């Protein structure tokens, strides 16, 4: 009990000590913390700080889903980062922090905010980085657009774009593009496929605008991307000629079509290389030359060098090169160049004579003369020229071709000479006295000679006749001491130069005739000299005209005249002394084209000097003016032959000269002083492709796989040839995998070219397939040797990831399967390929397409085939395969790789396996249903005429579906059932759109008198190439209509009228009978045979089932159709009869009349007797009338409207309308009880006898109308019938009576 008191005493103290231990608490700043996302793992993130009023030791902890980010020191509260933070993934999160003093635990929720840092680089979002643009794209156009994204925020996420590098890197291309803030790449300058580059690669980089990272400012940039830009060449440039000038020579006698030279032009648009054609657009001599489309200039007309003397013997033609297609401006792209063609001389002219004086001759061919007149004194001294003769000989040819010989012919040729005897070009011709004794006026007053000019080369000649008139002289005349004075004078001497003062004449007559005066007779240059009349001194009158090169010797006649006018003459031979006054003249121009290396220069400089031949003044010496390349040539100083001393090398010539070596040849004479002429000889050393392009190194490049269009690297080559045609370097790639790359060539300068190696825009390299590409780059130019140089290029593929499988195209080749269970099991196998080494491939069926004749037929073939996972194709339902249901089965398959890495396409493209279903002859032909009834009217059907037809099809194809028809059996079945075979039919075949038609034709005429049906069995059989043929039969019934159904219709109109109304008649007959009307004949009737009918028509009326109408049936049907009957009557129908109805002859007509009279007489007697008997039997008639009344009350009223009478009869077209011919259907009790009853009467033979009847009877009581006059008592039977019809309308009563117009005809 004591311990209980002790416990009660200590319990309050214990409670006080427990309640005094307070729990720890966190500070107010422990609810939120901000940490940068770039805080390194392991760094102190923050401290957990708590306080405990009891100063107990505290421990710390962190819990919750995000506690893994941190690690905490439980004793110190230091919190370190355990996992990296990422603002872009988790921008903020919560953790639970806790502290404990060992007894109490305090928790709190802390918000951790992650602060963004610039830790992300921009990433391009584009999937493709290639494009193509036209070279004419306007400046400022957007070429391509890129987009990059930066996941950071603020300025760190603001993306800017930069163009780091442009390949090729030139001053022009570096500024060719610019990129906008939105990523649009804009063209900054003009493009040119030919003058700049055809391909560009832009290295782009995207950078953010900067931010803080690791406590420092940081700007992040993306990995570079490469944008490939292909420039598409546009036709914007004109063509250009390969050479800067063209020249050639051709002989003037060249035939039409002779090739002169070839010009060549190329399209300046290298990427298009359009076809260039050539034409002559202008010419100094139109029509002389033309050009073919391939650039060959040829002779197109007759040439004549002599017409070109004023044009330096050259023809200029303007050649225009035109591209085949229009340029981008819609205009022709063309360029022009003048071509020089020198026409060389041939000896095509003979010398001619002209009546003129040099140098004033025009030498027009029309002015050539053949007759000349001259004068000379008799006994003139030898070598005295004929005065008054102005003859010039001229040959327009050049050089030796223009040299000719002069001679004399004729009866007086011995008396004269011609001077000169040899000349070239043009010369004044003088005829001089040779034998003065023969020149005797007393013997001949007129002498004739022929001057012959003969071509020195061709022996062509011309003849001129000179008529010389002799002058008579006196015997005493002045006499010169010499008959010929040989004088000399320098050419071009001063005017007044004294030639001689030694010539004197004496006159034997003394002074009788006065002093002697001297004068020069005109002609042959006499106007160039003058003589002093008194002294005889000879001086030069005009020294400037004395030119030895034009005329070396002048033959003048000096006349001495005495006072008696007697005169004498002497010959003056004045020879001009040559001075060196003419420099050498070089013929033509010299442009030589020679290929380098093996080409040889061999050209002779042709020159001449007009100074005196065989003197130093005309002796020419050739020399070369020293120059840069003159040492490579030799020039013969005497002949002017220029040769090269060794092989010429185009590459040794300054490229600026473009292969042209201009040599200056000095042509000098040896006179005093020496005169010279310079001529330039242009030797164009034509470049040949004798230098190979060379590379300066081998190349190693690397490229990432799966990056299409990536730039790989650049190779360079150099060609020493100088012309663009020969140093144009084209690059080509060879080696395994070369087709994955494209090498874009770009011409640099001075024979250098570079090739940019790119991946094709649509090619993605695969590291697993090929890690290295060992390529060979070939540099070649279009030389005939076909040689090239190469460089090794190694491309290393850097690995990224892989490719989808592909289907083997060979395994998808179309196969054929025969229908209807002909084949089973596997028919083919689809093979798939995958360049990946770990590929696990399967084949799956994607779709099945069933088509027949190109038309989709749905799912009819879906179960026929199956595809196994290994690609094996099996037949599932062999028996179900049916060609007639489906012609072509298309299995759409694809391959997939089970081991494809995520993110890559595991499926191949769909492939189509075509399975052609081969037809088997499994379908017999079948006849198409034919509801037509075939009817034969033998009288109307002729041989070779179609009487029936069948149509058949065969669902098989080709030969299996071709149908042939045959008649297996044909028999005639009579109406009594008997039959017999016939051979009267044949069958022909036609086909249209797969439908075969068999036409059954008659072979011979049919018998029109027999009745029955032809049964024809037709067989359709196909024509298979393999296996048995299949056939089908059908039997046709051909109904015959014999002559018993022939009906004759008589008309009141003529045969012609019936024929004209035939269509209306047939239409009315068809309307009434509903049959087909077959007209046999239409004939006129003898006018004496009938009273009304004028013509008849025989016809058949046949139903569609093969039956025909008889005469009776036709009558009934026509009577029933009132509209048709009315129309036929209007068209003249009179009688319908059988064919046997013939017109009676006169004898028969007479017999008929007699018989008719006898019958009429008997009839009259019978009527009289009958009337008497009826009077006696009136009582019996009364009884019968009463009985008839009773019967009439039992019979319904039938009011029959009057109908039209049938023409030619006493019958009406209504049933029971003819009481005489038709028996009543109801017995009214009027018949006699026995055949011997004398009181028997017909219904239309009622008399007027009255019968005592009860008129008050209800049945017979008449209702009188007011005002009606009294009527006589009716005949008893009439009253009975009238009473029965009481109540009918008045119109009905009126219609009970009619008049029969048929009684008007004579046909009774």
Swiss-Prot record:
Location of Phosphoserine modifications: 1245, 1297
Primary subcellular site in the record, as a coarse category: membrane
Region (Mediates interaction with USH1C and MYO7B and is required for proper localization to microvilli tips and function in microvilli organization): 1178-1308
A GO BP entry: regulation of microvillus length
Domain Cadherin: 33-124, 125-241, 242-353, 368-480, 481-586, 586-695, 695-807, 809-927, 929-1051
Keyword flag Isomerase: no
Membrane topology qualifier: Single-pass type I membrane protein
Function, as annotated: Intermicrovillar adhesion molecule that forms, via its extracellular domain, calcium-dependent heterophilic complexes with CDHR5 on adjacent microvilli. Thereby, controls the packing of microvilli at the apical membrane of epithelial cells. Through its cytoplasmic domain, interacts with microvillus cytoplasmic proteins to form the intermicrovillar adhesion complex/IMAC. This complex plays a central role in microvilli and epithelial brush border differentiation. May also play a role in cell-cell adhesion and contact inhibition in epithelial cells.
Protein name: Cadherin-related family member 2
Gene: Cdhr2
């Amino acid at each position: 009990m004591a311990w209980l008191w002790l416990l009660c005493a200590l319990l309050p103290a214990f409670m006080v000590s427990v309640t005094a231990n307070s729990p720890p608490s966190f500070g107010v700043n422990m609810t939120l913390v901000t940490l940068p996302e770039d805080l390194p793992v392991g760094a102190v993130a923050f401290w957990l700080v708590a306080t405990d009023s009891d100063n107990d030791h505290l421990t710390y902890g962190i819990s919750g889903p995000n506690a893994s980010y941190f690690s905490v020191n439980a004793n110190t509260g230091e919190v370190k980062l355990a996992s990296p933070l990422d603002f872009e993934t988790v921008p903020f999160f919560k953790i639970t922090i806790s502290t404990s003093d060992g007894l109490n635990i305090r928790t709190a929720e802390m918000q951790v905010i992650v602060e963004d840092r610039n830790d992300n680089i921009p990433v391009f979002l584009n999937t493709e980085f290639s494009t193509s643009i036209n070279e004419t794209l306007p400046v400022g156009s957007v070429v391509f657009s890129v987009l990059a994204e930066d996941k950071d925020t603020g300025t760190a996420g603001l993306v800017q774009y930069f163009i780091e590098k442009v390949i090729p890197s030139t001053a022009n291309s570096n500024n060719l593009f610019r990129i906008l803030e939105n990523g649009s790449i804009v063209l900054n300058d003009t493009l040119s496929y030919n003058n700049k580059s055809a391909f560009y690669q832009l290295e782009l980089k995207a950078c953010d605008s900067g931010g803080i990272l690791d406590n420092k400012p940081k700007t992040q940039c993306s990995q570079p991307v490469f944008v490939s830009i292909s420039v598409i060449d546009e036709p914007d440039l004109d063509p250009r000629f390969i050479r800067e000038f063209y020249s050639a020579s051709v002989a003037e006698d060249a035939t039409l079509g002779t090739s002169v030279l070839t010009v060549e032009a190329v399209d300046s648009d290298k990427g298009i290389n359009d076809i260039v054609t050539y034409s002559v657009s202008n010419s100094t001599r139109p029509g002389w030359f033309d050009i073919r489309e391939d650039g060959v200039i040829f002779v197109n007309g007759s040439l004549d060098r002599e017409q070109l003397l004023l044009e330096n013997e050259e023809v200029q033609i303007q050649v225009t090169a035109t591209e085949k297609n229009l340029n981008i401006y819609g205009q022709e792209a063309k360029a022009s160049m003048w071509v020089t063609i020198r026409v060389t001389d041939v000896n095509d002219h003979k010398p001619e004579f002209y009546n003129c004086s040099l140098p004033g001759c025009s030498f027009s061919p029309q002015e050539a003369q053949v007759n000349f007149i001259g004068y000379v004194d008799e006994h003139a001294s030898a070598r005295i020229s004929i005065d008054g003769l102005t003859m010039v000989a001229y040959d327009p040819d050049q050089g030796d071709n223009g040299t000719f010989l002069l001679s004399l012919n004729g009866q007086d040729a011995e008396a004269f000479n011609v001077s000169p005897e040899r000349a070239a070009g043009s010369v004044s011709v003088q005829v001089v006295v040779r034998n003065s004794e023969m020149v005797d006026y007393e013997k001949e007053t007129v002498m004739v000679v022929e001057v012959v000019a003969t071509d020195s080369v061709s022996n062509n000649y011309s003849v001129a006749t000179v008529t010389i008139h002799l002058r008579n002289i006196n015997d005493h005349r002045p006499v010169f001491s010499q008959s010929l004075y040989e004088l000399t004078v320098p050419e071009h001497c001063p005017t007044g130069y004294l030639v001689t003062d030694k010539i004197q004449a004496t006159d034997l007559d003394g002074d009788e005739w006065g002093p002697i005066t001297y004068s020069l007779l005109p002609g042959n240059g006499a106007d160039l000299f003058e003589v002093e009349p008194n002294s005889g001194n000879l001086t030069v009158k005009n020294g400037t005209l004395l030119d030895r090169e034009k005329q070396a010797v002048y033959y003048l006649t000096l006349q001495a005249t005495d006072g008696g006018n007697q005169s004498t003459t002497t010959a003056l031979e004045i020879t001009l002394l040559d001075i060196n006054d003419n420099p050498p003249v070089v013929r033509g121009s010299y442009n030589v084209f020679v290929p380098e290396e093996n080409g040889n220069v061999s050209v002779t400089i042709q020159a001449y000097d007009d100074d005196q031949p065989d003197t130093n003044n005309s002796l020419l010496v050739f020399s070369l003016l020293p120059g840069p390349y003159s040492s490579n040539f030799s020039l013969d100083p005497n002949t002017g032959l220029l040769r090269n001393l060794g092989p010429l090398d185009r590459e040794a010539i300054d490229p600026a000269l473009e292969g042209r070596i201009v040599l200056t040849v000095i042509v000098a004479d040896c006179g005093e002083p020496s005169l010279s002429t310079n001529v330039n000889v242009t030797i164009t050393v034509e470049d040949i492709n004798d230098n190979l392009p060379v590379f300066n190194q081998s190349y190693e490049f690397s490229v990432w796989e799966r990056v299409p269009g990536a730039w790989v690297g650049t190779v360079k080559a150099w060609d020493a040839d100088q012309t663009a045609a020969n140093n144009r370097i084209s690059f080509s790639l060879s080696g395994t995998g070369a087709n994955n790359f494209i090498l874009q060539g770009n011409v640099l300068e001075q024979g250098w070219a570079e090739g940019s190696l790119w991946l094709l825009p649509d090619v993605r390299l695969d590291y697993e397939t090929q890690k290295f590409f060992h390529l060979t780059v070939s540099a070649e130019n279009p030389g005939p040797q076909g040689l090239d140089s190469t460089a090794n290029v190694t491309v290393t593929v850097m690995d990224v990831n892989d490719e989808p499988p592909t289907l083997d195209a060979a395994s998808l080749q179309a196969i054929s399967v025969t229908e209807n269970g002909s084949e089973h099991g596997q028919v083919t196998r689809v093979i798939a390929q995958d360049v990946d080494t770990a590929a696990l491939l399967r084949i799956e069926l994607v779709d099945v397409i069933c088509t027949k004749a190109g038309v989709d037929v749905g799912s009819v073939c879906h179960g026929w085939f199956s595809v196994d996972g290994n690609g094996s194709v099996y037949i599932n339902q062999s028996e179900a395969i049916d060609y007639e249901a489906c012609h072509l089965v298309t299995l759409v398959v694809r391959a997939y790789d089970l081991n494809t890495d995520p993110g890559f396409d595991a499926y191949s493209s769909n492939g189509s396996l075509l399975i052609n279903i081969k037809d088997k002859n499994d379908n017999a032909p079948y006849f198409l249903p034919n509801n037509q009834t075939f009817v034969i009217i033998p009288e109307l059907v002729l041989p070779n005429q179609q009487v029936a037809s069948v149509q058949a099809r065969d669902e098989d194809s080709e030969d299996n579906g071709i149908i042939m028809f045959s008649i297996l059996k044909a028999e005639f079945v009579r109406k009594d059932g008997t039959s017999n075979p016939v051979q009267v039919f044949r069958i022909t075949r036609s086909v249209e759109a797969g439908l075969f038609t068999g036409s059954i034709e008659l072979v011979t005429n049919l018998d029109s008198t027999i009745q029955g049906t032809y049964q024809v069995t037709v067989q359709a059989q196909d024509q298979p190439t393999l296996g048995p043929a299949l056939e089908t039969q059908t039997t046709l019934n051909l109904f015959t209509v014999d002559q018993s159904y022939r009906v004759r219709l008589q008309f009141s109109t003529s045969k012609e009228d019936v024929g004209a109304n035939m269509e209306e008649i047939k239409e009315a007959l068809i309307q009434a009978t509903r049959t087909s009307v077959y007209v046999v004949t239409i004939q006129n009737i003898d006018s004496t045979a009938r009273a009304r009918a004028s013509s008849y028509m025989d016809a058949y009326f046949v139903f569609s089932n093969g039956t025909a109408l008889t005469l009776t049936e036709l009558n009934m049907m026509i009577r029933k159709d009132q509209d048709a009957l009315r129309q036929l009557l209007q068209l003249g129908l009179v009688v319908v009869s059988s064919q046997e109805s013939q017109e009676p002859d006169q004898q028969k007509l007479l017999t008929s009349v007699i018989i008719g009279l006898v019958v009429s007489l008997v009839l009259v007697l019978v009527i009289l007797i009958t009337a008497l008997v009826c009077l006696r039997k009136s009582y019996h008639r009364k009884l019968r009338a009463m009985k008839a009344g009773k019967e009439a009350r039992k019979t319904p009223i039938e009011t029959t409207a009057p109908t039209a009478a049938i023409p030619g009869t006493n019958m009406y077209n209504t049933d029971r309308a003819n009481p005489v011919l038709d028996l009543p259907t109801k017995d009214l009790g009027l018949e006699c009880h026995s055949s011997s009853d004398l009181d028997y009467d017909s219904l239309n033979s009622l008399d007027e006898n009255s019968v005592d009847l009860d008129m008050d009877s209800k049945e017979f009581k008449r209702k009188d109308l007011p005002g009606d006059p009294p009527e006589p008592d009716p005949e008893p039977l009439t009253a009975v019938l009238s009473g029965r019809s009481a109540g009918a309308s008045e119109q009905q009563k009126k219609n009970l009576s009619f008049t029969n117009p048929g009684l008007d005809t004579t046909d009774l």
